[in-house]
Swiss-Prot record:
Binding positions for L-aspartate per the UniProt entry: T274, V275, R280
Family per similarity comment: Belongs to the Caudovirales PurZ family.
SUPFAM superfamilies linked: P-loop containing nucleoside triphosphate hydrolases (SSF52540)
Residue positions binding ATP: S23, T24, G25, K26, G27, G51, H52, T53, Q190, N305, Q308
Binding site for dGMP: S23, N49, S131, T132, R146, T205
Name the UniProt record assigns to this protein: N6-succino-2-amino-2'-deoxyadenylate synthase
Catalytic activity: dGMP + L-aspartate + ATP = (2S)-2-amino-2'-deoxyadenylo-succinate + ADP + phosphate + 2 H(+)
Listed Pfam families: Adenylsucc_synt (PF00709)
Residues that bind Mg(2+): S23, G51, T274
Stated role: Involved in the synthesis of the atypical nucleotide dZTP (2-amino-2'-deoxyadenosine-5'-triphosphate). Catalyzes the condensation of aspartate with deoxyguanylate into dSMP (N6-succino-2-amino-2'-deoxyadenylate), which undergoes defumarylation and phosphorylation respectively by host PurB and guanylate/nucleoside diphosphate kinases to give dZTP. dZTP is integrated into the viral genome instead of adenine by the viral DNA polymerase. This Z-base probably completely replaces adenosine and forms a triple bond to the opposite T-base. The resulting non-standard viral DNA is called Z-genome.
């Protein structure tokens, strides 16, 4: 017997996942698809140890840790943060009030909450290399331990200014809303190769980073998730979080068909991490990483970002060929803005775009 209710209205659902180490441009892709496909509901399971960036047309950079960046959607009605979220309530309120247009904000009652005690615990040290010390890991562990007195979002928000701004919902209410929504977009956090299950342990994050986990953390019902299109985000030169030599920390290895290089060697300005503001490490493209991520995440289409980074058009085409052995590259990005993303450019068009942006 089908579980789909008679009022099921979902026509399309886009899931955005990162196929590398994060910072591939998921926020840019989310903004682009939000404007292009106009979802009514945005879903996310955020954590304060990961940030998304969207550069608006006027050059203003919008950095979110708690809210998705598909807010460019002209049809947006509601943002829903699922039960797998780890919420920094102060940051959530700050981002919500800064939105260009206030829409309904729903948060699942069972989302974890970062409290000062969690930040203090992580500030004391003893964490994995690359930790942002945001309190996210400690908050998540506190939820899993299920000790008496542990506060989840539904209780914690009662004494916070968010109370009255946000709608706290249970699973049934969220399901009913999602089933009645025509178009949904869900944004993943971090990157596949940082997954605690699939990454280079212990040089990883505290949770799984796959399409399956995104679906679970957002609380998407199976009958919604099974029609989803998965768009995987990649960059021509993947990056990792910075080393912290003063603390004796190394952020981990790369794939065997990849080598570490320097931004200066590529003629590029140094990049810095969104959350910790530390210099990023950069590597050559790994086909092994791309193929593994595509298979594990069920990627249907790929967004390839920073297409102007390779030293020649031929080098860019080699990367495209490696990806398209497994999945179609549907979107190509050449810059930080939504207007720098191109949908299904031909190889001839790519030649002109590469020449223009490479200058």
């Amino acid at each position: 017997m089908l579980s789909i209710p008679p009022y099921y209205r979902v026509k399309n659902c886009n899931l955005i996942v990162d196929c590398q180490y994060g910072s591939t441009g998921k926020g840019l892709l989310a903004g682009y698809l939000g404007a292009l496909e106009a979802p009514q509901v945005l879903c996310m399971a955020p954590s304060p140890n990961a940030g998304h960036t969207l550069v608006e047309e006027d050059g203003t950079a919008r950095v979110h840790k708690m809210l998705p960046l598909g807010i460019t959607s002209p049809s947006l009605e509601r943002i829903y943060l699922g039960p797998g979220s780890v919420i920094d309530m102060d940051r959530l309120l700050e981002e919500y009030l800064a939105l260009p247009r206030q829409v309904e904000l729903w948060v699942h009652q069972n989302a974890a909450v970062v409290l000062q005690e969690h930040r203090d615990e992580e500030a004391a040290g003893g964490l994995a290399p690359g930790s942002t010390r945001s309190g996210a890991g400690s908050a998540f562990i506190a939820k899993i331990r299920r000790r008496p007195g542990t506060l989840l979002f539904g209780e914690a928000v009662r004494d916070h200014p968010l109370h009255g701004v946000v709608r706290v919902v249970d699973t049934r209410t969220a399901q009913d809303m999602l089933f009645r929504t025509r178009s949904i977009q869900a944004e993943g956090c971090q990157g596949y190769s940082l997954s605690v299950h699939h990454g280079a342990y212990p040089y990883c994050t505290a949770r799984d980073v796959t399409t399956a986990q995104l679906i679970a953390d957002c609380g998407l019902p199976y009958d919604v998730a099974r029609i989803a299109r998965v768009v995987g985000s990649m960059r021509t030169y993947p990056i990792r979080v910075a080393n912290r030599p003063e603390a004796g920390e190394w952020s981990g290895p790369c794939y065997p068909d990849s080598v570490e290089c320097q931004f200066a060697d590529l003629g590029l300005e140094q990049e810095y991490t969104t959350v910790t503001k530390l210099p990023r490490r950069i590597f050559t493209f790994s086909a092994i990483q791309a193929h593994e991520a595509i298979a594990q995440n069920g990627v249907d289409e790929v967004f390839l970002n920073f297409a102007q980074y390779p030293p020649s058009l031929g080098a860019l085409e080699d990367i495209l060929d490696a990806i398209e052995a497994r999945a179609e590259v549907t979107y190509v990005g050449f810059g930080p803005k939504v207007t720098d993303v191109y949908h299904t450019p031909t190889r001839a068009e790519l030649e002109g775009l590469y020449a223009r942006y490479r200058r």
